[in-house]
């Protein structure tokens, strides 16, 4: 009888993840027993501290490559770079929530640990090299977001958004599990490396190939829902509009980042030899996503819904890098785009929160009328974010789109790069429309927005980062290049 073998475990490789999970768990207890109502901001500050500590413990791990838990989790510079991006997203999202929650009358201490648990799910997706781990990561992220989406209870729009997200998310989870079952039935493994080796072998039969392709299709459908690729995007505008604005901001970048990180692993390590099957499908979904997202945004007069459709379009641009993951430039474009998009989009949502303090209807395009005369610095910051999201030089968004389009062109998808160029031109219309309202329209009696300390820090960091990366992109380029030296090794 074979003895039970315990796989080797190197917890050092999981240091940032363990810090986030442990800190969030302890913080839940501390909040319940030691932090009274009315002082829940302290829980938020402690959560920010935990995310900062998680980032710091990752610094000595730069350049370290290894697997743990029997090869189910992998630390490499790619995963570590994404971990730092995810921690930054969590910090900025919590910072913009500190005054928003009490202002809306929904301040609850568990909000901040939930954000931390969501970040832990994103980190798990970046490090996972096993389909079971990827499922755990995406469900950890999703379940926390179901709760956070309905956090504005008893506001009906928030409850409706949470219910829609929960039902459709459960549907996507079913696809994921069924896909894992088919892939395991075809290959006998859930490890991405072993799946890739089996798919590359000449001994794979027609039946197993059919099962493998069917399972891969199921998993890709699940990821498409999480990323909001068309036609799996229909939930996005309603869920973003009904969610508390900081939650919508977090979802717009966090869900995409985590799911696409796992998708890069899956395509690059698990299915590289089957790209003749999945590449045309993903290319079609990407083109449709860019078209639907940007055309949908043009028709919006609600800026929050416009940013939701904008996030759909940007999912298509990020996919340009993901699809050519077999080429060095593809994952580089993905990492660079995720960082730039996170800064620009979180900054834009922070401006929305500054206006939202004046009432529930502060998302209309008319609410931006004459903003430059009422709050000049806020208008300038929003203009920076809009120019960046539109891809206008010298903002960082221009370099990100250029990098992604170049990756698609050099990766053998020139037609898709051209679709990206055309849809970027369409996108410029609705971004510039916001800028025109702020600078070239007279105020119509709207109150002057007030900026609290948290929002000021968020907006300032995002604006400075957007400009700095646009003007001096070389250091960030160097970082992402070093992050991919050992990807898939």
UniProtKB/Swiss-Prot annotation:
It comes from Chloroflexus aggregans (strain MD-66 / DSM 9485). GO terms for biological process: ATP synthesis coupled electron transport. It catalyses: a quinone + NADH + 5 H(+)(in) = a quinol + NAD(+) + 4 H(+)(out). Belongs to the complex I subunit 2 family. GO terms for cellular component: plasma membrane. It is found in: Cell membrane. The lineage of its organism: Bacteria, Bacillati, Chloroflexota, Chloroflexia, Chloroflexales. It holds the Pfam family Proton_antipo_M. Its main location: membrane. GO terms for molecular function: NADH dehydrogenase (ubiquinone) activity; NADH:ubiquinone reductase (non-electrogenic) activity; quinone binding. The gene is nuoN. NDH-1 shuttles electrons from NADH, via FMN and iron-sulfur (Fe-S) centers, to quinones in the respiratory chain. The immediate electron acceptor for the enzyme in this species is believed to be ubiquinone. Couples the redox reaction to proton translocation (for every two electrons transferred, four hydrogen ions are translocated across the cytoplasmic membrane), and thus conserves the redox energy in a proton gradient. The chain crosses the membrane at residues 15-35, 44-64, 78-98, 106-126, 131-151, 166-186, 209-229, 244-264, 278-298, 306-326, 333-353, 378-398, 412-432, 459-479. NDH-1 is composed of 14 different subunits. Subunits NuoA, H, J, K, L, M, N constitute the membrane sector of the complex. This is NADH-quinone oxidoreductase subunit N. Its EC number is 7.1.1.-. Keywords: Cell membrane, Membrane, NAD, Quinone, Translocase, Transmembrane, Transmembrane helix, Transport, Ubiquinone. It is a multi-pass membrane protein. InterPro entries: NADH-Q_OxRdtase_suN/2 (IPR010096), ND/Mrp_TM (IPR001750).
């Amino acid at each position: 009888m074979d003895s039970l073998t315990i796989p080797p475990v190197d917890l050092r490789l999981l240091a940032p993840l363990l810090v986030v999970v442990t800190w969030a768990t302890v913080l839940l207890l501390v909040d319940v027993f030691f932090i009274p109502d009315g002082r829940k901001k302290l829980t938020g500050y402690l959560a920010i501290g935990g995310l900062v500590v998680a980032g710091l413990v990752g610094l000595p791990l730069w350049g370290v490559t290894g697997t743990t838990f029997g090869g189910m989790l992998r630390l490499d510079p790619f995963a570590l770079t994404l971990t730092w991006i995810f921690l930054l997203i969590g910090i900025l999202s919590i910072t913009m929530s500190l005054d928003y929650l009490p202002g809306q009358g929904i301040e609850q201490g568990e909000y901040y640990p939930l954000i931390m648990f969501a970040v832990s799910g994103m980190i798990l997706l970046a490090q996972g090299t096993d389909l079971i781990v990827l499922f755990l990561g995406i469900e950890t992220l999703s379940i926390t977001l179901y709760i956070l989406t309905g956090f504005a209870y008893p506001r009906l729009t928030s409850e409706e958004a949470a219910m829609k997200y929960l039902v459709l998310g459960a549907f996507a989870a079913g696809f994921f599990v069924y896909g894992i079952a088919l892939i395991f039935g075809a290959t006998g493994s859930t490890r991405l490396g072993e799946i890739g080796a089996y798919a590359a072998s000449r001994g794979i039969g027609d039946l197993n190939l059919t099962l493998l392709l069917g399972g891969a299709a199921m998993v890709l459908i699940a990821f498409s829902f999480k990323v909001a690729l068309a036609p799996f995007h229909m939930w996005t505008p309603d869920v973003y509009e009904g969610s508390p604005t900081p939650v919508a901001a977090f979802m717009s970048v966090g869900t995409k980042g985590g799911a696409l990180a796992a998708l890069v692993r899956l395509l690059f390590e698990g299915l590289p030899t089957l790209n003749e099957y999945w590449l045309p499908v993903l290319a079609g979904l990407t083109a449709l996503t860019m078209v639907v997202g940007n055309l949908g945004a043009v028709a919006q007069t609600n800026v929050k819904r416009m940013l939701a459709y904008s996030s759909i379009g940007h999912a298509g641009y990020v996919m340009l890098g993901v699809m050519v993951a077999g080429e060095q430039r593809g994952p580089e474009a993905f990492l660079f785009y995720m960082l730039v998009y996170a800064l620009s989009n979180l900054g834009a949502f922070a401006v929305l929160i500054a206006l939202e303090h004046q009432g529930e209807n502060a998302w209309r395009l008319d609410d931006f009328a004459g903003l430059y005369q009422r709050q000049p610095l806020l208008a300038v910051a929003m203009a920076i974010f809009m120019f960046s999201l539109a891809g206008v030089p010298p903002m960082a968004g221009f370099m990100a789109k250029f990098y992604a389009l170049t990756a698609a062109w050099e990766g053998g998808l020139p037609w898709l790069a051209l679709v990206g160029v055309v849809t970027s031109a369409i996108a410029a219309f609705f971004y510039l429309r916001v800028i025109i309202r702020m600078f070239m329209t007279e105020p119509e009696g709207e109150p002057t927005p007030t900026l609290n300390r948290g929002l000021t820090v968020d907006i300032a960091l995002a604006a400075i980062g957007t400009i700095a990366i646009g003007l001096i992109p070389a250091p960030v380029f160097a970082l992402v290049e070093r992050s991919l030296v050992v990807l898939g090794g």
